[in-house]
């Protein structure tokens, strides 16, 4: 619409207090602005405020849509519980939050795909979803989305050769002088179908290229840690990748938070290390991020539990199979912290 085009108006009968009416008239007269314009601007401001608070997008067509959160679960080392965390939180987003969730298995080990019992066929997976953005973007992204055993959770299955996709992006950039990332194109295609409230990616356990590419296509990052010194160094490397992604391709990426996982609560090493790490890791963030703070060190500590290993064997989210047990309750506390952090942006 042209900038000075008249705004179409319609009758919308509401009652306001006499005091508010008098204030509107006085302000209108003082500013030389119609009361209808003042009301429009005031209502738009309130709509934006409460939409942001509720995580809702107000569309130009008048529809209100829930904001889509794209969350990467990343780590600089294996064995810290990325896949368990991704599945556990996804289930709780669905069960408690009543969200429609899409999982993306971006780890060549494809553990998340196996855990969620996706009926894989070797054709519809993440490699296909990304490569079609290059060779035939008209193929609907839904083609590569499969149901899981859970009603409101779908998945784009993993592929052991997912690392090759990164090299395709580099070749594309070299040949076409095109900086558009295939991961971003895939994510845009997913967002466009407007079917999912939460999109969660399980990434490769490293600080190299297999982790870098997914980070360029997500909004938030959650980092699980184990209570040992190597986790701090691994955290630093992953956080560097977040900063790099922010500078190169994804200016809006944020570290949502980080937490301790698989903690043997009664061991002296955990009791000594965790308080120290709660001071050390924020210092690492400040060092890498030019003095700025970022992300929440979640209060929740996920205790080590045999139930996690049982859930893996049973191909289940631990929060579904053992929700009433201690580890299930731990993850539920973490979920509440995560949703609060998302609400606060």
Language-model features, listed with the residues they occupy:
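P-loop NTP-binding core
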Residues: 2-12, 22-26, 30, 35-37, ...
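Short, structured motif recognition centered on aromatic/hydrophobic residues
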Residues: 16
């Amino acid at each position: 619409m042209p900038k000075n085009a008249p705004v179409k108006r319609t009758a919308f009968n509401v009652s306001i207090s006499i005091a508010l009416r008098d204030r509107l008239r006085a302000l209108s007269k003082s500013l030389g602005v119609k009361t209808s314009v003042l009301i429009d601007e005031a209502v738009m401001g309130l709509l934006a405020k409460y939409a942001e608070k509720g995580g809702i997008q107000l569309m130009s067509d008048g529809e209100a849509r829930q904001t889509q959160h794209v969350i990467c679960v990343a780590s600089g080392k294996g064995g810290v519980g990325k896949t368990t965390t991704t599945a556990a939180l996804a289930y709780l987003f669905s069960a408690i939050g009543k969200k429609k969730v899409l999982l993306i298995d971006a780890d060549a080990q494809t553990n998340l795909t196996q855990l969620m019992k996706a009926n894989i066929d070797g054709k519809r997976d993440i490699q296909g979803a990304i490569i079609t953005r290059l060779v035939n973007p008209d193929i609907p992204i839904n083609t590569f989305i499969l149901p899981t055993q859970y009603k409101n959770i779908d998945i784009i299955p993993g592929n052991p050769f997912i690392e090759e996709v990164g090299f395709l992006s580099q070749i594309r950039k070299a040949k076409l002088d095109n900086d558009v990332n295939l991961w971003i194109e895939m994510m845009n295609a997913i967002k466009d179908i407007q079917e999912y409230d939460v999109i969660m990616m399980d990434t490769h356990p490293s600080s190299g290229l297999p982790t870098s590419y997914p980070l360029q296509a997500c909004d938030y990052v959650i980092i699980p840690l184990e209570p040992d010194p190597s986790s701090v160094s691994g955290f630093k490397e992953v956080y560097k990748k977040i900063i790099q992604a922010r500078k190169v391709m994804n200016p809006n990426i944020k570290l949502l938070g980080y937490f301790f996982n698989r903690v043997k609560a009664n061991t002296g090493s955990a009791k000594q290390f965790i308080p120290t790490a709660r001071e050390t890791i924020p210092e690492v963030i400040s060092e890498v991020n030019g003095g700025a703070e970022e992300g929440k060190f979640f209060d929740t500590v996920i205790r080590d539990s045999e139930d996690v290993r049982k859930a893996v064997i049973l191909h289940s989210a631990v929060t579904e199979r053992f929700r009433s047990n201690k580890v299930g309750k731990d993850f539920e506390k973490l979920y509440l912290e995560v949703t609060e952090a998302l609400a606060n942006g």
